Amino acid sequence: MPYSADLDIRVTDSSLRDGSHAKRHQFTVEHVRSIVGALDAAGVPVIEVTHGDGLGGSSFNYGFSHTPEQELIKAAVETAEQAKIAFLMLPGLGVRSDIREAADNGASICRIATHCTEADISVQHFGLARDLGLETVGFLMMSHSQPPEVLAKQARIMADAGCQCVYVVDSAGALILNAVSDRVSALVAELGDDAQVGFHGHENLGLGVANSVLAVEAGALQIDGSTRRFGAGAGNTPVEAFAAVTEKLGIRTGIDTLKIIDAAEDVVRPIMDGDCLLDRLSLTMGYAGVYSSFLKHADSHASRYGVSGAEILIEAGRRKLVGGQEDQLIEIALGLADRKSAETAVAEKKSA
């Protein structure tokens, strides 16, 4: 069953939300107007705008925003002529009044994210969003960490609370091919006609497009991506590449492939601080199953304490850290620094 009469699937571009991590949350109103204008003209149906960690994310722990996110949402709504504007919120970080304000500012899709075993904390937020007339989407973050049957049960909690589409969210970019299909299929089987299923991928193992296509084949009707891979870690599924692949496969997205390619190169790239690369740290994240937004934090702590960023991420993966535990990266870095100092002292003593 297609998403609608005109679209086989619906694509949401997260450049102005997930890309906030890569931009260190320094988006301006001008950035938003430029990117929304280009994506809207290319036919992208949904554009997500908030701090990288969602409503209320501007903080010492996650990083402070250059511009209040509600101002960015307003600018996006004012600029978009066809695209719907979505926002993300994490219960406990964002609060109910944030949802109301975003709705008042014209956003029409509320995306609520929880760790993939904690769907129950989203129930009241879905209820509020539906009462406000918002379309609702649920994110089961770090979906690689749980088997399909567990995710299906969590998806049921969200759907029963009023969520209209539940996403398998590969926050770490750690899922590989059939692991995506199995999880999406499990949600489709569980939810039936009660809610749609979506997929949010990252490029940390270089599989964003392939995983997204497999998700569609398994029944996903909504797919996330970011133009020019503008997202956390190695970035998200590149919308321009996904649009090209789906066009070749005869999957209707409503996106003009050539226009989105131009938008990626001419509009989005100049706003990025640098390309989102599949480098040592981002690849380590996918390999170790680490939350993608940890990348910049790990890199900063590695420089500050003179330790290996990759070792920080490997230990974060061993501890199975999740979003919200960024402070533990400092603890890990300090531990590595202490160990390095001790090893240096032993080596110097032996050589004396």
From Swiss-Prot:
It comes from the Bacteria. Residues 9-261 form the Pyruvate carboxyltransferase domain. The record marks 17 as: Transition state stabilizer. It catalyses: (S)-4-hydroxy-2-oxopentanoate = acetaldehyde + pyruvate. The keyword Metal-binding applies. Substrate binds at residues 17-18, 171, 200, 291. Belongs to the 4-hydroxy-2-oxovalerate aldolase family. This is 4-hydroxy-2-oxovalerate aldolase 5. It comes from Rhodococcus opacus (strain B4).
